[in-house]
A protein has these predicted regions:
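Core catalytic alpha/beta fold that binds nucleotide/phospho-ligands
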Residues: 1-104
């Protein structure tokens, strides 16, 4: 589970966690919510992984999705030998975004 407060600060650090192949999802909707959801989803993935030295830019990917008030996005980590896939559920609210996932 991860919750991120709504705010524009995320734009200043986006280059540290947004991959080139993730930019399409950000361009297709509300930029702040899309960035916050990417960050929050990657935090959720990180919390479920049993790996150290995870680089959010190089090791975690959110696949393209259409931004809605709530939904599910597919993601994958590339840090471990299993390169685990995730289904990350999300909700957006005026003040925050929430993401959560479970391991199979």
């Amino acid at each position: 589970v991860d919750i991120e407060q709504y705010g524009t600060r995320v734009k200043r650090v986006a280059s540290k966690f947004i991959r080139e192949d993730e930019r399409a999802s950000i361009a297709s909707g509300d930029e702040i919510y899309a960035l916050l959801l990417h960050w929050s989803a990657k935090e959720t993935m990180f919390k479920l992984m049993e790996e150290e030295a995870v680089d959010f830019l190089d090791h975690l990917r959110i696949f393209p999705f259409t931004l809605r008030e709530s939904g599910v996005m597919e993601a994958q980590e590339f840090r471990s030998s299993t390169e685990q896939k995730f289904l990350i559920h999300y909700d957006t609210h005026p003040d925050y975004v929430l993401t959560f996932a479970c391991l199979d």
